[in-house]
Amino acid sequence: FITNGGCVENSTLGSQNEVAPFNTEIKPGGGWDMWRKIAAQDPAFGNPNKFCYNPELSNWMSATVTTLDDRIPPYVQKICKRDPFSGKVVTGGIVTVKDSNWLLSWTFNRQPQFRSQPKGQLVGWIYGLFSDKPGNYIKKAMRDCTGKEICMEWLYHLGVPENQIEDMAENSANTIPCMMPYITAFFMPRSAGDRPLVVPEGSVNFAFLGQFAETKRDTIFTTEYSIRTAMEAVYTLLNIDRGVPEVWGSVYDIRDLLNATVQLRDGKSI
């Protein structure tokens, strides 16, 4: 059972005062290298180079931010209208800063995020889709920023007064950046056959799993997609008489289609 490719391959971590390196070199032994070697044997095994040929198009950056005192949480609460220390839903999803040069988004899930998390601290997640653009406050590309600088940009968009931003980023938070060169590789343009079938025709002893294997009707970027490919692989190769759960047929349900239209227009009438 082969997981071909890998969205998190070559991911690197920085620190509060260090940049996360942008490491794009595909080295022997990884998921992309293995898939390339398999694909060289037969076209039925897909075309990995369609997905990993240009990390400039498939990368983005994320960061975890831990608040260390009571200075930042009020700004989070002001935007999400919920007490982040309540133990209940905080942001209720991601908050996207639409006019951010990095297209910055952030979220705080139900706290504490970790069992051993100190009381009075929050752990949140920040990410930016345009890692090569200068920030609105930090005039550097996101990929060239330390954790502290990413935090400063985020605090700027939270509405923190500019004369307090640097001090708060340095002393009221610890921010760890992560660069992911291939994180959206599965969204790269592709053609039929670029992803191999879960069980290629004629295969009797191996199958492909995960986001770069082809299964019917489902959409990548979900855990369900990976699980469905694994179920299909196991049931097929081991001749297990069980059906893989159907993908929800929303594309054929007029109620779902109408609701999607409303959501895409933010509830505005046509």
Where do the model's predicted regions map?
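Acidic, Ser/Thr-rich low-complexity intrinsically disordered segments
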Residues: 253-270
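C-terminal segments that line or cap access tunnels to active or ligand-binding sites in enzymes
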Residues: 2, 9-252
